[in-house]
Amino acid sequence: MVHGPRTKKHLPPYESPPLTLLLEPVAPVQQTGIQAPQRKPPSQKGHKKGHKKVYSVTVPCNGCDKNLEFCARTSSATILTLQNLLLKDLDFLCSTCETNHG
């Protein structure tokens, strides 16, 4: 809430800024040099995990509209859950806004 002198000006109702989600798989990066042998995770009978991919996610900071970019490795079902949360009431803050409003 903003405190100040009374005015006769009526502001339009607050609307959330439009949110654009760019969720797409990221191509795997080929590494050069020595690599540690990959271990297979223990098998889980009766539980089929979804195939995990790396997704690049860009969301605006809720404080200053700066674009925040990060990658996540998850299944398509989980990235859709993240998308649903972002379209509802989950907001991200950049480190500057977190310090100022934390």
UniProtKB/Swiss-Prot annotation:
A zinc finger (unnamed) spans 61-97. Keywords: Activator, DNA-binding, Early protein, G1/S host cell cycle checkpoint dysregulation by virus, Host cytoplasm, Host nucleus, Host-virus interaction, Inhibition of host innate immune response by virus, Inhibition of host interferon signaling pathway by virus, Interferon antiviral system evasion, Metal-binding, Modulation of host cell cycle by virus, Oncogene, Transcription, Transcription regulation, Viral immunoevasion, Zinc, Zinc-finger. It is found in: Host cytoplasm; Host nucleus. A motif (Nuclear export signal) lies at residues 79-87. One of its GO terms (molecular function) is protein domain specific binding. Residues 2-36 are annotated as: E7 terminal domain. The keyword Protein biosynthesis does not apply. Highly phosphorylated. It comes from the Viruses. GO terms for biological process: DNA-templated transcription; symbiont-mediated perturbation of host cell cycle G1/S transition checkpoint; symbiont-mediated suppression of host innate immune response; symbiont-mediated suppression of host type I interferon-mediated signaling pathway. Residues 30-52 are annotated as: Disordered. The keyword Zinc-finger applies. One of its GO terms (cellular component) is host cell nucleus. Homodimer. Homooligomer. Interacts with host RB1; this interaction induces dissociation of RB1-E2F1 complex thereby disrupting RB1 activity. Interacts with host EP300; this interaction represses EP300 transcriptional activity. Interacts with protein E2; this interaction inhibits E7 oncogenic activity. Interacts with host TMEM173/STING; this interaction impairs the ability of TMEM173/STING to sense cytosolic DNA and promote the production of type I interferon (IFN-alpha and IFN-beta). Plays a role in viral genome replication by driving entry of quiescent cells into the cell cycle. Stimulation of progression from G1 to S phase allows the virus to efficiently use the cellular DNA replicating machinery to achieve viral genome replication. E7 protein has both transforming and trans-activating activities. Induces the disassembly of the E2F1 transcription factor from RB1, with subsequent transcriptional activation of E2F1-regulated S-phase genes. Interferes with host histone deacetylation mediated by HDAC1 and HDAC2, leading to transcription activation. Belongs to the papillomaviridae E7 protein family. The E7 terminal domain is an intrinsically disordered domain, whose flexibility and conformational transitions confer target adaptability to the oncoprotein. It allows adaptation to a variety of protein targets and exposes the PEST degradation sequence that regulates its turnover in the cell. This is Protein E7. It comes from European elk papillomavirus (EEPV). The gene is E7.
